[in-house]
Amino acid sequence: MIEFPTIDIKSTGANILRLRKLNKLSVKDLQMYFGFEGPQAIYKWQWGQCLPSVDNLFALSRLFNVTIEEILVERESTKIFLLYTKILFRVVFESFIE
């Protein structure tokens, strides 16, 4: 079965917060690093309201000295949902064959 991974935005945000604190950086430090006018984007990432762009994820990975995969958190329920979808599809498909 091919699994389509999805990102857990809330957990990824918490992970960005954890990595920022682990590296002893403030929100202001990240704001200055990215050249943002204000801190809103950083807070939105940390609160899991949105994800950084690919470019910003790459920059975070370099700043935190981790891989992008170490920043992103996969949603666990994705695997359960895909299994449920596969079973449901099989049941519906088999009912058409009979």
What are these regions (language model features)?
Residues M1-N23:
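A short, Lys/Arg-rich alpha-helix, primarily the initiator
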Residues M1-T6, R62, L72-E98:
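Short, charged recognition helix plus adjacent turn
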Residues L17, K28, F58:
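Residues within the helices of the helix-turn-helix
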Residues R20, Q31, S61:
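The alpha-helix within a helix-turn-helix
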Residues K21, G35, W47-Q49, E76:
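Residue-level detection of the helix-turn-helix DNA-binding "recognition helix"
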Residues K24-K44:
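Short alpha-helical DNA-recognition segment
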Residues W45-Q46, N56:
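DNA major-groove recognition helix of helix-turn-helix
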Residues D55-E70:
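DNA major-groove recognition helix of helix-turn-helix/homeodomain DNA-binding modules
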